[in-house]
Amino acid sequence: MNTAELSRVCRQVRRDIINMTANAGSGHPGGSLSAVELMVSVFYNHMRVDPQNPKAENRDRFVLSKGHAAPCYYGVLAKVPGIDASTGSLGQGCSIAVGMALGAKLQGKDTKVFAMLGDGECQEGQIWEALMSAAHYKLDNLTVMVDNNGLQIDGSNNEVMSLGDLAAK
């Protein structure tokens, strides 16, 4: 998909986010809006998915660990259906994605797993345990993305608990 088409999809997803959160009278539009470009790019340019066959066995998988970005995810899913996992508390999605990637690798499948995390949830120890497992098992079929927007529900990350140089970690 070219840049103009991606921009059009991003604008529509942003409209969907605002409509969903406004109509619900609830939600976290900021955390969804900060994830739009990354999620749209992954679904439309990097993942192997077929909207006509969303349960295809050989499709790639996506795990949204950053649950506050669910309205963004729903906006993307309107055109590219298929939820591979529902996550609970922040930090659990990374472990789920590692398990999916390891399972695919052990079964010899050509499946890639993509996980989107929020930078605030990277303060959770479970994230780092999952990432150590991914490195140990050499999960080259796993892509973990962090929406590094500098904010979480309690304030700025630096005020709550600085992550330091996240890219270096």
Regions found by a protein language model. Name each.
Residues 49-55, 59-61, 80-169:
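Glycine-rich ThDP/TPP pyrophosphate-binding loop and its adjacent helix/strand module
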